[in-house]
Amino acid sequence: MVREVRENELDDLLELYLYLHEKSVPEMTEHLKETWDTILHDRNHHMIVNEVDGKIVSSCVCVIIPNLTRNIRPYALIENVVTNEAYRGKGYATACLNYAKELAKQSNCYKMMLLTGSKKEETFSFYRHAGYNHADKTAFIQWLE
């Protein structure tokens, strides 16, 4: 079942992020709690999860960003697309991305964007199959410390 994350599912989400790029689950600090609270109460920040048999197996983040161009239409940024390795290839992440797409449409977004750090062809194929292309724009990243 695809839905938005519940407040009591932070630990489950952090465990899932171990399949993304995290090396360990962060310690439950005041900063982490405040960040979680900020995310949960931001109407433009959507933490989407796919639950199978009571377990969160896939997730993505969809942030709706207000915009003054394109006829004052917002755009959506997708981040942290991840699926538990044991559940990959079954459409769970695609379902999360489709949920994000519906949220973006409901918000009248004119586009959705995502970046991937992967250089694997199967990752590119996955995103192309989900409706994304890498030909229209060029991304530049500046990492901040």
What is each residue range found by the language model?
Residues 14-37:
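Conserved GNAT-fold acetyl-CoA-binding loop/helix
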Residues 37-49, 77:
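A short helix-loop-beta-strand connector motif used in the catalytic cores of GNAT acetyltransferases and
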Residues 71, 84-95, 107, 119-124:
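Conserved glycine-rich acetyl-CoA-binding loop
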Residues 80-83, 89-102, 129:
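Conserved acetyl-CoA-binding loop-helix of GNAT-fold acetyltransferases
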